[in-house]
Amino acid sequence: MSNAKTLYEKVYDAHVAVAAKGETPILYIDRHLVHEVTSPQAFDGLREKGRNVRQVGKTFATMDHNVSTQTKDINASGEMARIQMETLSKNCEEFGVTLYDLNHKYQGIVHVMGPELGITLPGMTIVCGDSHTATHGAFGSLAFGIGTSEVEHVLATQTLKQARAKTMKIEVKGKVTEGITAKDIVLAIIGKTTAAGGTGYVVEFCGEAITDLTMEGRMTVCNMAIELGAKAGLIAPDATTFDYITGRKFSPQGEDLTAAIEYWSSLKTDDDAKFDAVVSLDASEIKPQVTWGTNPGQVIAIDQPIPAPESFSDPVEKVSAEKALAYMGLEAGKSLTDYNVDKVFVGSCTNSRIEDIRAAAAVAKGNKVAAHVQALIVPGSEQVKAQAEKEGLDIIFKEAGFEWRLPGCSMCLAMNNDRLGPQERCASTSNRNFEGRQGRDGRTHLVSPAMAAAAAIAGHFVDIRTITEKA
């Protein structure tokens, strides 16, 4: 029998601490990222049982979900938000956990902060009480979201019971055409697999179109692995990964880095390893993507008509499409370019890094936001914000009529003051278009940063390729 392993199996096997017969294996956890929303009860549990945080040096906290993006005032997002942030401060102080709070230069969205500081490294197991923890899989680490009781377990033991998942390979063959981004690639993938196609699997993304991506692009792809139902998404580390890691705050240095890279280079799927499922896409066929429905799998290319419910053979999908069109206020057969947007949001753990901000700024430069549109640019961290301002991108946005905000999760989820009103339509670079996700009865369309910025200027959805062709 072959001993060949997939990347996921290599990382998983390297972290099995206890594997008792008939029991779910216990994995050692290398990094635990913490935020204000899913941690209060976990710390309470430690207190009740008289336990400490087992590995404070491997635990990092920040405030992101309900922070205001207009002020550093802790009271700005309401009573619940204030209590959660104050509680996180007290808990981190009491238990000795590193916290990047509202006024810290490293504060930011947890999945932006980890990689940019070198906290995230290849071959690690990484958990966080947040479903988009898969983002860190871009480094060839096994990263996934956990619930609050599991947060407590990891704080107390630095381990977690975790069953072995099935494996899926998603290969994006060839090169993408001009103007196609990581967001378009991952939305096209989810359009093919559906929002449940990856359930029960850990996915490895590969192929030329994936390895061509920068680390920030790879993070966008892995961030949305959860949106096809997968437990986690990984990309094998390579020279692009090692270059990104080098010189960051918590990255290994000197001989330690050389030794680490030698090990990290072994973190790839063996040639004769078998996957439980394989999905492939032709990169050259991927066009700019826009979601039309209420899950990320309900997505089309910008030049395709909105699908009719009767075009779906699966009765469940048909009913889902009918409900989605009614909720979204869309008519089958029409083009998404026929619909005006009310708000535009560039941000979230999917698309708030410096390359995303640059892409939006390139479209915004010399243009003006349509009169009826409110457009928000929300950098993913203080570090991203500082870099963007150093490059003068904030000036470009302000001159074009965009709002330049402070870092946070912002309009991705209605847990702070940035939200949609009923029936407001939003072009959003976030990762979820569920009913009410951005505000009660709000209508979310997921797009790339360039597509979002273009919609802000036109006042409706446009094909970014028509703009870049003119330029």
UniProtKB/Swiss-Prot annotation:
Entry EC number(s): 4.2.1.33
Subunit description: Heterodimer of LeuC and LeuD.
Superkingdom classification of source: Bacteria
Cofactor: how bound: Binds 1 [4Fe-4S] cluster per subunit.
Pathway(s) annotated for this protein in UniProt: Amino-acid biosynthesis; L-leucine biosynthesis; L-leucine from 3-methyl-2-oxobutanoate: step 2/4
Pfam annotation, one family: Aconitase
GO molecular function annotations of the record: 3-isopropylmalate dehydratase activity; 4 iron, 4 sulfur cluster binding; metal ion binding
Gene: leuC
SUPFAM superfamilies linked: Aconitase iron-sulfur domain
Species annotation: Aliivibrio salmonicida (strain LFI1238) (Vibrio salmonicida (strain LFI1238))
Keywords per UniProt: 4Fe-4S, Amino-acid biosynthesis, Branched-chain amino acid biosynthesis, Iron, Iron-sulfur, Leucine biosynthesis, Lyase, Metal-binding
Function: Catalyzes the isomerization between 2-isopropylmalate and 3-isopropylmalate, via the formation of 2-isopropylmaleate.
Gene Ontology biological process terms in this record: L-leucine biosynthetic process
Protein name (Swiss-Prot/TrEMBL): 3-isopropylmalate dehydratase large subunit
Known cofactor(s): [4Fe-4S] cluster
